[in-house]
C-alpha cells in the first residue's frame, strides 16, 4: 500500500517489482489521482489500483490489512510556513499537526501485526512523529537522510513495525548523492 500524496510513481514501482502482490495507492488530491490512473493504464499493471482517500480519515475495511506501507505525508506544518495559492500543491505539501497525527495513526491501524511501514518526512518533524509513536507498541527505526556527505539531515526515513512495547532505534545516516551529484553507493544499495 502506498499512502501518500502523489501516490502514483511509488505504487507503480512496487506493483512492477512485485507482480504477485496487491498494491493499493491512496490519493486525496484529484489531479494527482488522475495522473496516477493514467500511469496505471499506460503501464497495464493488473495488481495495482488507486483509490481517492483522505489519509486522515480512517477506513475500517483496511484495518490490519497491509504487509507493507510506504508513506510520504506532507512535509510542512500549515501554520508554520507561507503556503502556496495552488490548492493542488497545498494538499500535497502542507498539513496540520492534528491531521499528521491522524495520518500516522491510520498507518499503524492499517498495518498487519507482522507488517512494516516506511515513512519519509522532514528531519525537523522527527521529534513530533516519535512523540506520537511513543503512545503505541512499536519499534521505530530512524535513519537520517543527508543530501551530501557532511551535510545536515534534510529528511528522515522511519521504519515501523509492531512490537510488545515501544522501542526506538537510530541507524547511521544514508547519504543520497556523491560529490558529483550522482546517487551514492548508500542509495544504490538501499534500492536493491
Name each model-derived stretch.
Residues 58-69, 77:
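A short acidic, Gly/Pro-enriched loop at the edge of an enzyme's catalytic core
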Residues 152-192:
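SAM/dcSAM-binding transferase cores
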Residues 36-37:
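Conserved SAM-binding loop
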Residues 73-102:
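Mobile active-site "lid"/loop adjacent to the S-adenosyl-L-methionine
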Residues 1-5:
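Conserved small/polar residues in nucleotide/adenosyl-binding loops
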Residues 96-153, 157-158:
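Conserved Class I SAM-dependent methyltransferase catalytic core
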Residues 7-20:
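Conserved SAM-binding loop of SAM-dependent methyltransferases across substrates and taxa
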Residues 22-27:
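Conserved SAM-binding motif I beta-strand of class I
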